[in-house]
From Swiss-Prot:
InterPro entries, per the entry: Alkaline_phosphatase_core_sf, DeoB, Metalloenzyme, Phosphopentomutase_DeoB_cap_sf
Protein name as catalogued: Phosphopentomutase
Primary role: Isomerase that catalyzes the conversion of deoxy-ribose 1-phosphate (dRib-1-P) and ribose 1-phosphate (Rib-1-P) to deoxy-ribose 5-phosphate (dRib-5-P) and ribose 5-phosphate (Rib-5-P), respectively.
HAMAP family listed in its UniProt record: Phosphopentomut
This protein's encoding gene: deoB
Catalysed conversion reaction: 2-deoxy-alpha-D-ribose 1-phosphate = 2-deoxy-D-ribose 5-phosphate; alpha-D-ribose 1-phosphate = D-ribose 5-phosphate
Family classification: Belongs to the phosphopentomutase family.
Pathway(s) this gene product operates in, as recorded in its UniProt entry: Carbohydrate degradation; 2-deoxy-D-ribose 1-phosphate degradation; D-glyceraldehyde 3-phosphate and acetaldehyde from 2-deoxy-alpha-D-ribose 1-phosphate: step 1/2
EC code: 5.4.2.7
């Protein structure tokens, strides 16, 4: 029986990569800076004391972080017995965004440059805005700028509810985001608007990675909240991922938990399970692992590390999330049977101590656990695609164009 379980702790970087300087991210270290803040007693809101991650540490997280950054994260046990394979990897892809990281994990690095809306005000071309107003029959639009998703709701949410004008905004990522109130604007109407935007961006040659529906609820500034009904409309990966190969070459199953299906534009996915929040994502993952058949991948993205704590620069929240994940990790490990492998990794960094609100260019951890996996140091990997190549080799698929297998 061969099954692989891939857990992406979204944004869980472990130290800036060699090329971080060109992204303005030299010195960033998501794990390291969280651990240091906890150790200094500066992250005691909702939790207390040094960062406590015994199960991730036993899989080699501390050792991988030390190899990446030169510093062992304070609070973790330097003398823990290592029961997993560990490594750290740098990104070959040109960006530090979610699709690039995930596609590269699945063996397909993004070697082209995404399009971006780089102007912080009046960010979108007028012809694009006019087209959206016309095609979607809109009374106008709000935003048209770079913004944090929560800040823009406080600024424009009330006006949106009154006027019916959707809020358009972007960031340093290759994204076009649309925020609308679930009740006054309507969720299905928001999704339909995002489909129109996706088509317009693709046909217009803007080369934008994702259109993101950002529904929210609430009745006044300070009370607006984004809901779990986010929907990402991504372009398709430029080549077959290891997920698609498993389905096409072996008739295998690929089960998406959380936003994985959206990230791969639903290509190479045979089942989708929606869940919102760390515990709910964990529960759904446990359920799918219990029933996953032979020749299957269960692939989960734990988005809260990025969206709730990384972008919002919430160090105590990120630390508490990591500790919750670590407490529940033995539930996943107990479901790993003979022939199975469990892979824990990330897609980029999002250092909550770093200036701004954007992702950070960092190494990612690669932690692998299973009865047939030799524990120990698997060194530095020069592309996330080593994960995809490992999966291709493990399942007996045709090799990927990039990456070297771990074993």
């Amino acid at each position: 029986m061969k099954r692989a379980f891939i857990m992406v702790l979204d944004s869980f970087g472990i130290g800036s990569s060699k090329d971080a300087e060109k992204f303005g991210d030299k010195g960033s270290d998501t794990l390291g800076h969280i651990a240091e803040a906890c150790f200094r007693g500066e992250a005691d809101k909702g939790r207390k004391g040094p960062l406590h991650l015994p199960n991730l540490t036993a899989l080699g997280l501390g050792k991988a972080a030390e190899a990446s950054s030169g510093k062992f994260p304070p609070g973790l046990d330097k003398n823990a017995e290592i029961i997993g394979a560990y490594a750290y990897a740098s990104e070959l892809s040109s960006g530090k965004d979610t699709p690039s990281g995930h596609w590269e994990i699945a063996g397909v690095p993004v070697l082209f440059d995404w399009g971006y809306f780089s102007d912080t005000e009046n960010s979108f071309p007028q012809e694009l805005l006019d087209l959206l107003v016309e095609k979607a029959n809109l009374p106008g639009y709000l935003g048209n700028c770079h913004s944090s998703g929560t800040v823009i709701l406080d600024q424009l949410g009330a006006e949106h509810m009154k006027s019916g004008k959707p809020i358009f905004y972007t960031s340093a990522d290759s994204v076009f985001q649309i925020a609308c109130h679930e009740e006054t604007f309507g969720l299905e109407r928001l999704y339909a608007l995002c489909e129109i935007a996706r088509e317009a961006l693709t046909e217009g040659g803007y080369n934008i990675g994702r259109v993101i529906a950002r529904p929210f609820v609430g009745d006044k500034p300070g009370h607006f909240e984004r809901t779990g009904n986010r929907h990402d409309l991504a372009v398709e990966p430029p080549a077959p991922t290891v997920l698609k190969k498993l389905v096409d070459e072996q008739g295998g199953e690929v089960i998406s938990v959380g936003k994985i299906a959206d990230i791969y534009a639903h290509v190479g996915i045979t089942k989708k399970v929606k869940a919102t929040g760390l515990d709910a994502l964990f529960d759904a993952t446990v359920g799918e692992m219990k029933s996953a058949p032979d020749n299957s991948i269960v692939f989960t993205n734990f988005v809260d590390f990025d969206s709730a704590w990384g972008h919002r620069r919430d160090i105590p929240g990120y630390a508490a999330g990591l500790e919750l994940f670590d407490r529940r990790l033995p539930e996943l490990m107990a479901l790993v049977k003979e022939g199975d492998i469990l892979i824990l990794t990330a897609d980029h960094g999002c250092d909550p101590s770093w200036p701004g609100t954007e992702h950070t260019r960092e190494h990612i951890p690669v932690l692998i656990f299973g009865p047939g996996v030799r524990p120990g140091d698997y060194g530095y990997r020069d592309t996330f695609a080593d994960i995809g190549q490992t999966l291709a080799h493990y399942f007996g698929l045709s090799p990927m164009a990039y990456g070297k297998p771990f074993f």
